[in-house]
From Swiss-Prot:
Location of the tRNA-binding domain: 365-469
Domain of life, source organism: Eukaryota
Annotated organism of origin: Danio rerio
UniProt-recorded name of the protein: Tyrosine--tRNA ligase, cytoplasmic
Class of enzymatic activity (EC top level): ligase
GO CC, any one term: cytoplasm
PANTHER family, sorted: TRNA-AMINOACYLATION COFACTOR ARC1 FAMILY MEMBER (PTHR11586), TYROSINE--TRNA LIGASE, CYTOPLASMIC (PTHR11586:SF43)
Amino acid sequence: MGEQLSPDEKFQLITRNLQEVLGEERLKEILKERELKVYWGTATTGKPHVAYFVPMSKIADFLKAGCEVTILFADLHAYLDNMKAPWELLELRVKYYEQVIKAMLESIGVPLDKLKFVKGTDYQLSREYTLDVYRLSSMVTEHDAKKAGAEVVKQVEHPLLSGLLYPGLQALDEEYLKVDAQFGGVDQRKIFTLAEKYLPSLGYTKRSHLMNPMVPGLTGSKMSSSEEESKIDLLDKNQDVKKKLKKAFCEPGNVENNGVLSFVKHVLFPLHSEFVIKRDPKFGGDKVYTDFEEVEKDFAAEQIHPGDLKASVELALNKLLDPIRKKFESPELKKLTSSAYPEPSKNKGGVKGNPKQTTDDDEVIPSRLDIRVGKVISVEKHPDADSLYLEKIDVGEEQPRTVVSGLVAYITEEQLQDRLVVLLCNLKPQKMRGIESQAMVLCASIEGEPRKVEPLDPPEGSAAGDRVYVEGYESGKPDDELKPKKKVFEKLQVDLKISGEFVAQWKEQNLMTKLGRITCKTLKGGNIS
């Protein structure tokens, strides 16, 4: 996308509309040799709001300049920042952020195939990263850590140790994502300077830092995901947008800390080449502006009324939000939204930490399945059936379960012995040739001549009893026993597939454990049963 641009032109595009750049010369040197690698990270806390269009518009610039762009969903950071995201909701929040950020990018015409999306805990729990956290903690003073997080981490009277770790982890992300530059809001500046100071002490390269301005919230302060009154949510309905804008701080002639005016400057103008003030003909009629300075000048001179400014912003904003709202009308994304951000009242009568728990026994959702990692302790042929194996499988309970599987034609006893498998554990026990089977080994299969079958593979390092879940359905409580007449598994099984990347999925949502994805070795596109 940036092949026709010179290094200087790429630099201008990368740095336009930024408030500050640290390490400009490093950027210029890299651009003379190759494309720039940059990342933008977001802690998965409260719901993303309209100010997120500021970094989205810059990501569009980076791609136009030929940059390799990584978007980091910083789930661990969301927990470290005074537990703004509870541990049991982290996976759901990541999934929500991924869907809504992608919807935002699509709404402004950014191609998703040019972006790389990464979840923080995919690498931040590794041995190497953890060791670097300890190494860094032996160098960074409490003063420096507290100072670095002052404008990002929630400030409390007695700060938690987690908040002091936060800036150092963000610094390490630059190394582990293998980028040349980190992009973020100017409120991240102290974390960026901490990274520049300490990464070289670990033997790592100093990175450049790109900072966009912060958009004031509707109350005149920083727009914040965790402060409802300060921001407009991306899924707010038209009437909610109108109501919030009506309450917004916007004094006649006052251009300081004016969240509505700032939104025009930092969001609408970078995305569009013009902005239209809509007003009654008796007050001059509609007026088209092609640069922000003219809007600011007319507002300061009170030639633009706050009511007309708000009404015009409302119209432009709803055009941006409409495709995002439409995408989130799907049942799956509605369910994801309510699960990732449960209403406080919904938790009162249920089990703490289970926002998905429901009294509706007829709702067919994957959290009703009790799927676990199991380890095959012993395997032998069924005494009365040549096509069946009789296995003892440890699923993390006091005693191993007896399982009968029709796998003789597809896998040898030696291959099954001591193997980790994935089991459905809450089917009603069923006798197979006289022996009761207490679970089912889940396998991928492809029909044909010959039929191909492979047991699913848990992530490396898994242990017997590890829970397996579908992304977006982590918090539900499995049925004690699936009632055969309800055919819950049969209904869900229709949408259980192996993806093109050999990942087990339900309706394109990954089957996971706490350590990663459930996979199979070779049966791309296979069914799961």
